[in-house]
């Protein structure tokens, strides 16, 4: 099964959720919190990775749901 990693990325004054390798956004939100909640549910359902970017576009946090629903967090600096 193909992994459906989810990225939460800045978009203008808001945030977007985008599946890795796809062109279209899954969600556009005013808040990062809502975007993260949406992306986390998709990542859990598909046993994928949630990658959260900061306002500068750099990866801030990676949550790995590949082996179940308990994420393995990796913070980027």
Regions picked out by a protein language model, each given a short descriptive name:
Residues 59-77:
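A cross-kingdom feature marking charged/low-complexity
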Residues 2-24:
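Short aromatic-glycine-(Arg/Gly/Cys) micro-motifs in beta-strand/loop hairpins
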Residues 22-33:
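A short, exposed loop/beta-hairpin motif centered on an aromatic-Gly-Thr core
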Residues 23, 57-59:
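Residue-level signal for glycine
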Residues 41-53:
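Short arginine-rich
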């Amino acid at each position: 099964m193909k992994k459906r990693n989810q990225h939460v990325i800045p978009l203008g004054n808001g945030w977007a959720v985008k599946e890795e390798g796809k062109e279209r956004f899954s969600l556009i939100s005013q808040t990062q919190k809502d975007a993260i909640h949406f992306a986390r549910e998709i990542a859990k359902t598909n046993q994928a990775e949630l990658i959260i970017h900061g306002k500068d576009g750099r990866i801030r946090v990676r949550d790995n749901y590949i082996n179940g629903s308990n994420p393995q967090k990796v913070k980027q600096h």
